[in-house]
Design a protein with these regions (language model features):
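Nucleotide-activated chemistry modules centered on ATP-dependent adenylation/adenylyltransferase
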Residues: 2-8, 13-408
Length: 408
């Protein structure tokens, strides 16, 4: 039976073919696209969606929501997946899906469709977001539909289908990799990058200068934070999206933010990804340093122990879970005093912190001084401190000969 379906639409070949395929079955298709900071000709995208069979096209500008509500919270967590990936795509998907669900309710669509493949993480992220926010919605995933992928096995068949149905196709060859962009990053995968030993081509990178060709002088930058969230760059207060865009510009021209890694996908396989995250790399380095000045050691250790878990939750698509809400509450409390300014230098792919200040610093220069501290710290008290903390070690040493005898 024909249905009213909202399709997560990127303007690319796959979602354009899916749009026509669903429309050919008599369905009423509303294409939804989200502006998360990617470089896109939105008028051309709307025109292509209509040419692909859509009855209506909805474009939502969610840049501020994305940065303020998803990217900055991840920076406050210091969330890196497997210690390296800044989660650019992982953070964007729940933001996009949330906005899509809002549009679906306005348009009275009870079904949503997406173009994510059955091998990737995005299918999980989109559908888990819908499960949390709109459990009543049904999903259509053509790349998991045998009728679809038996007819459209790959790019060659998709191009032929598009030409047959009058869908504009920019090129038939394309670059030897695929990419996904938002205001936080660009990710590259597939094609030549499926060989984990293959060096990325120099002309692949779009946001960052080649560190070898970056300026020969360090560029000084300051970042201000309020309760762990970036608030100003070089003394200028800006909205979250504008601040991240400016951080991208500064860090990118200095070659900062490239990562090439093999990661563990949620669906079980290993995957090679190359990422450019210039502004995010700069902001997280500054944030991490300011925590050293303002954050209690034990609170930091507790939060740090949860970073892999938080990053995994984001990567796997559980942003809107109760577990994530509980962890966000912990992060909120941990960031209560992370307010201040960090001074940095950007130079040929490197971010170097050169100083930091805070009105709520835990650092006491008199206590830490190696010179005359005017009685601020009584060094004689260290004797008892060390003796008490050494008690377990002395007990272990005393037991050692007995344990050795028992092992014989």
């Amino acid at each position: 039976m024909p249905e009213k379906i909202i399709l997560l639409y990127s303007g690319g070949l796959d979602t354009s073919v899916i749009c026509r395929w669903l429309a050919e079955q008599g369905n009423h298709i509303v294409c939804f696209a989200a502006n998360v900071g990617q470089r896109e000709d939105w008028a051309a995208l709307k025109k292509k969606a209509l040419a692909s069979g859509a009855r209506k096209v909805v474009v939502a500008d969610v840049r501020e929501r994305f940065v303020g509500g998803f990217v900055f919270p991840a920076i406050r967590m210091n969330a890196l997946y497997e210690g390296r990936y800044h989660l650019g795509t992982s953070l964007a998907r729940p933001c996009i899906a949330e906005a899509m669900i809002e549009a679906a309710r306005r348009e009275k669509c009870g079904v949503f469709a997406h173009g994510a493949t059955g091998k990737g993480n995005d299918q999980v992220r989109f559908e888990l977001t819908a499960a949390a926010l709109a459990p009543e919605m049904r999903v259509v995933a053509p790349w998991r539909d045998r009728a679809f992928f038996s007819a459209i096995k790959g790019r060659t068949e998709a191009i032929a289908y598009a030409k047959k149905h009058g869908i504009p196709v920019k090129a038939t060859a394309g670059k030897p990799w695929s990419s996904d962009e938002n205001i936080l990053h660009i990710s590259f995968e597939a094609g030549m990058l499926e060989d984990p030993a293959a060096r990325p081509m120099d002309d692949m990178f779009e946001l960052t200068a080649d560190p070898r060709q970056a300026p020969d002088r360090p560029e000084k930058v300051t970042v201000d934070f309020t309760r762990g969230a970036p608030a100003a760059l070089n003394g200028r207060k800006m909205s979250p999206a504008r601040l991240l865009a400016e951080a991208n510009r500064l860090a990118g021209r200095n070659g900062v933010g490239r990562v090439d890694m093999v990661e563990s996908r949620y669906v079980g396989m290993k995957s090679r990804g190359v990422y450019e995250t210039p502004g995010g790399t700069l902001l997280m380095a500054a944030h991490r340093d300011l925590e050293g000045l303002t954050m209690d050691r034990d609170v930091m250790n507790l939060r740090d122990s949860l970073i892999p878990r938080m990053a995994g939750i984001i990567y796997n698509g559980y942003w809107f879970s109760e577990e994530m809400a509980a962890l966000m509450a912990l992060v909120e409390e941990s960031q209560r005093h992370v307010t201040g300014k960090v001074m940095l230098e950007l130079y040929k792919g490197n971010v170097t912190v050169t100083g930091r200040t805070s009105p709520v610093s835990l650092y006491d220069p008199m206590v830490a001084s190696m010179d005359d501290d005017k009685g601020a710290y009584d060094q004689a008290l260290a004797t008892g401190f060390i003796r008490l903390h050494g008690l377990p070690l002395r007990a272990q040493a005393k037991r050692a000969p007995k344990a050795k005898t028992l092992r014989k």
